[in-house]
Amino acid sequence: MARWRPDTAEREATPEALYLRRREFLALGAAGAVGLLLPRGARAGEPTGAALQVARKVDQAGGETPTPWDSVTGYNNFYELGTSKEDPSRNAGSLRPRPWTVTVAGEVKKPQTLDLDALTRMFPLEERVYRMRCVEAWSMVIPWVGFPLGDLVRRLEPTSRAKYVAFQTLLDRDQLPGQRRPVLPWPYVESLRIDEAAHPLALLAVGLYGRVLPGQNGAPLRLVVPWKYGFKGAKSIVRITFLADRPHTTWNDAAPDEYGFYANVNPEVDHPRWSQARERRIGEFFRRKTLPFNGYAAEVASLYAGLDLRKNY
């Protein structure tokens, strides 16, 4: 059976500049990369944006110090707003996060279109401090604000046929000017198995540092899956589709030998062009060891019992 794809002709675009920024990052080398990091003694900027009412705060990063606001909001991968790390923050003003709706479709008993403000009122918001590991071998610690994805999944009542959940980013060349270039086949789509989506660690984020989510970080709604590489976290979500079969996903389609469907953080499975055994924490000079499942093995390893994680990377 053919895999599900987003219903748009944009998926046919040729990804002519696929590796542009990822290669640039590698070419910087250790000395050049240091210039992108905040010095250890630098004073971080204060969080901006409207404050969110948070019901509880949970540290799920083992007491590690959160990455400063300046770095979390100024060093981003969001190709829809540009392919350099600084482009998303420069171009985020074009994104209009209100009004915003999310369409739920597919193998679900309660298909509907949800207003984002109504959606966020359904569930108490939590602040969760998570590690974030990029596939490019850098990392952050981020205090996200959101609600468990699993709570929404259960409320929508998936049918017995639902095995996967796909998340689709907004397709709008005016709001997301990076979509004017065929860097990737737009719109961006990512997916989880339904048991992954229902796991308590999976989060739909609407903010960070207690404030509404900035555009460059995927406003107004993004997926956060802390045991997976960052590209699994779809941003500016407008559609959630429950599916019987595994769907096409953007990076896995574009370069399947480099970006696996599962994308679990695994220091023993290298990217074809660099090691995944160590990472550079933004704000630090020396690399640190990468932890299996990004440090969340105790919580999530059982999801993959019996699965060859070298083949299913």
UniProtKB/Swiss-Prot annotation:
Q: Kindly report, in one word, the top-level EC class recorded for this enzyme.
A: oxidoreductase
Q: Where is the signal peptide?
A: 1-44
**EC?**
1.8.5.-
Catalytic activity from the UniProt record: L-methionyl-[protein] + a quinone + H2O = L-methionyl-(S)-S-oxide-[protein] + a quinol; L-methionyl-[protein] + a quinone + H2O = L-methionyl-(R)-S-oxide-[protein] + a quinol
One GO biological process this protein is involved in is: protein repair
**Superkingdom as given in the UniProt entry:** Bacteria
Its Gene Ontology molecular function terms?
A: metal ion binding; molybdopterin cofactor binding; oxidoreductase activity, acting on a sulfur group of donors, quinone or similar compound as acceptor
Q: Which HAMAP family match?
A: MsrP
Q: Which NCBIfam families match?
A: PRK05363.1
Question: Can you tell me which family this protein belongs to?
Answer: Belongs to the MsrP family.
Q: This chain belongs to which protein, by name?
A: Protein-methionine-sulfoxide reductase catalytic subunit MsrP
Q: Which gene encodes it?
A: msrP
